[in-house]
Amino acid sequence: MLDFEKPLFEIKNKIESLKQSQEKNDVDLQDEIDLLEASLERETKKIYTNLKPWDRVQIARLQERPTTLDYIPYIFDSFIELHGDRNFRDDPAMIGGIGYLNGTPVTVIGQQRGKDTKDNIYRNFGMAHPEGYRKALRLMKQAEKFNRPIFTFIDTKGAYPGKAAEERGQSESIARNLVEMASLKVPVIAIVIGEGGSGGALGIGIANRIMMLENSTYSVISPEGAAALLWKDSSLAKMAAETMKITAKDLHHLNVIDSVIDEPLGGAHNNIEQQAIDIKQAFVDQLEQLQQQSADELVEDRFNKFRNIGAFIEK
């Protein structure tokens, strides 16, 4: 339960208590239950339409929030995962493969968090090593060779900062991806589904179109990290989140991303099937637009998109 959801938790407890009493004592409490359920829906709408940036950070970090592998079966047909960077080893924190989007062959790449402690250790908490980014690049170059559109799911706190990762060229692998992705001659569409952290997110994020789920975040550093750097106090993360403009709405307003996909009431984890349907429709719509462009136009479109980010006019 998140801090801002405490009022909802209290109502849910009352509903559950009434249901148990109704079953145990064989009394009709349905009217009271209906009233509480209506109250729960109203309160949920009230809370989720007035979320603060720090609230959205908490939602983006939820353990039960859907991951790349949760969405793939709903969006793509006949997905086959491919492994390895052909240089060192496979990286479970970065998954990728081929499949079909409404009959069109596509390449799918995404960061993958774990679902529990054991899985998180296996997936390295969604923080990819250099071999993960090199695997992603291998699949992207393969997609370009066979003229397959590329879809990437961004969901990471950042690239893994460990000693071994640095020894194997973490920064070089990300930088190489930025260079190579900028010149890919196929449509590239990215979506931030959870946290989009720093260079780890950018390593698969140089796309013609970038979308974000309503409660996802995208930033150069975590709010805790920013607070520690700016004010020498990581406990001021909530204040940092307000200042950093890391929410989907703020980034859309700043033209860093192209569109925001609404989430079901209470977050994507409350209705993954509906969320996947919305993502798939957005993918289809964006792909139809990009397929009207030539290979050279796709590259120019991508270059201009990133060239214009951060541009401003002094008056």
Swiss-Prot record:
Record domain CoA carboxyltransferase C-terminal: where: 32-289
Annotated Gene Ontology cellular component terms: acetyl-CoA carboxylase complex
Record has DNA-binding as a keyword: no
Catalytic EC class: transferase
Annotated metabolic or biological route of this protein: Lipid metabolism; malonyl-CoA biosynthesis; malonyl-CoA from acetyl-CoA: step 1/1
Disulfide-bonded cysteines: none
Biological process per Gene Ontology, one example term: malonyl-CoA biosynthetic process
A Pfam cross-reference name: ACCA
Annotated localization: Cytoplasm
Superkingdom field: Bacteria
Record flagged with keyword Metal-binding: no
InterPro entries for the chain: Acetyl_CoA_COase_a_su, ClpP/crotonase-like_dom_sf, COA_CT_C
Reactions it catalyzes: N(6)-carboxybiotinyl-L-lysyl-[protein] + acetyl-CoA = N(6)-biotinyl-L-lysyl-[protein] + malonyl-CoA
Keywords: ATP-binding, Cytoplasm, Fatty acid biosynthesis, Fatty acid metabolism, Lipid biosynthesis, Lipid metabolism, Nucleotide-binding, Transferase
MF GO annotations: acetyl-CoA carboxylase activity; ATP binding; carboxyl- or carbamoyltransferase activity
Enzyme nomenclature, EC number: 2.1.3.15
Subunit structure: Acetyl-CoA carboxylase is a heterohexamer composed of biotin carboxyl carrier protein (AccB), biotin carboxylase (AccC) and two subunits each of ACCase subunit alpha (AccA) and ACCase subunit beta (AccD).
Function as written in the Swiss-Prot or TrEMBL entry: Component of the acetyl coenzyme A carboxylase (ACC) complex. First, biotin carboxylase catalyzes the carboxylation of biotin on its carrier protein (BCCP) and then the CO(2) group is transferred by the carboxyltransferase to acetyl-CoA to form malonyl-CoA.
Similarity field: Belongs to the AccA family.
Database matches in PANTHER family: ACETYL-COENZYME A CARBOXYLASE CARBOXYL TRANSFERASE SUBUNIT ALPHA, ACETYL-COENZYME A CARBOXYLASE CARBOXYL TRANSFERASE SUBUNIT ALPHA, CHLOROPLASTIC
HAMAP family, alphabetized: AcetylCoA_CT_alpha
Name used for this protein in its record: Acetyl-coenzyme A carboxylase carboxyl transferase subunit alpha
Organism: Staphylococcus haemolyticus (strain JCSC1435)
